[in-house]
Amino acid sequence: MSGNGGGIGTGLGSLAGSGRTVTTIAEVRAAADAVRAAGGRVGFFGTSGALHEGHLTVIRRMAAECDLSIMPLFLAPVPGVTSDAVPAYDRDFDADAALAFDAGVNLVFRPAVAEMYPALPVRTAVVPADELAAPWEGAEDPSFLRMAATALAKYYNIVGPCRAYTGEKDWVPLTVLRRMVVDLSIRAEIVACPVVRLADGLCASSRNSRLSAADRAAAPTLYAALTAAVAAVEAGERDAEAIRSLLRRRISAVAPVDYAEVVDATTLARVDPLAGELRLLVSADFTGTHLFDNVGLTVRDADADADARVTVPAVGTTAAAPATDRRTSG
């Protein structure tokens, strides 16, 4: 088991401890405070469970960079917080905890609903600004981004100053979190980890387990469309609408398109022509399961001869997981 603390060599393993489960906010705060008081670094990775290789890759990085690695395992119907947008894939929290400990988590936080939310329904929420949230909410329940931001703000408040790890796969929630910690002066440093892809290019995702065989075979079209769009930009295309049309055309051949966008990587504002640090964002509905993907692109200048550079790893170089295990195949 690798979850034994001291990730950055500060000798705080005895404070962090090997993998253990706690159930109260006070226990989490006591552990984090002790490590910080000794000069150590606290890491936090928020997830709702159903761990797969994408999650585990983030956890391993957190464990390598922090002296105490904390992960929650909590998902329950909470009026005012939870959303129907959270998919109903299977969760085995005991198995998830074992995987997390093996990857380097020191502390799994498994609170009861009454511990997390003693007064229901919840009356306070973090509401992302319309320019960050509105264009993307059509893919799912409009309350999803609010739910995610509210839950993570609460976790960051519980843990205290920390490095807050997340993945680049969900670029819109990542952007919301980055803005939230700045706007609300939350003492969390957002650490974004690259997308983990399976050998065929599909993002590692818990949602993959809900796909039919036909949809699973078609799903890599998302990344294929993104790479085709990148190739078009590298060949000199600077018309953002042309890139959006290319993405929609490729993806609509296999699934209804929720959105296919080219945006500023920081603000999520639509761009045209293509210039600067950009993100290509796509989402499609595979028989009720919404899959998301994105790639980063730097266009140094809007001129036709400008250089374009892809900023994500090639297919299969980050992770290729066995298809027989849902926890490593999606």
Swiss-Prot record:
Binding site residues for ATP: 167-170, 196, 204-207
Pathway assigned in UniProt: Cofactor biosynthesis; (R)-pantothenate biosynthesis; (R)-pantothenate from (R)-pantoate and beta-alanine: step 1/1
Gene Ontology BP term (one): pantothenate biosynthetic process
Reaction equation(s) it catalyzes: (R)-pantoate + beta-alanine + ATP = (R)-pantothenate + AMP + diphosphate + H(+)
Active site location: 55 (proton donor)
EC number of the protein: 6.3.2.1
Keywords: ATP-binding, Cytoplasm, Ligase, Nucleotide-binding, Pantothenate biosynthesis
GO molecular function, one term: ATP binding
InterPro entries: Pantoate_ligase, Pantoate_ligase_C, Rossmann-like_a/b/a_fold
Major enzyme class: ligase
Localization in the cell: Cytoplasm
Known role: Catalyzes the condensation of pantoate with beta-alanine in an ATP-dependent reaction via a pantoyl-adenylate intermediate.
Binding partners and assembly: Homodimer.
Extra facts: The reaction proceeds by a bi uni uni bi ping pong mechanism.
Protein name: Pantothenate synthetase 2
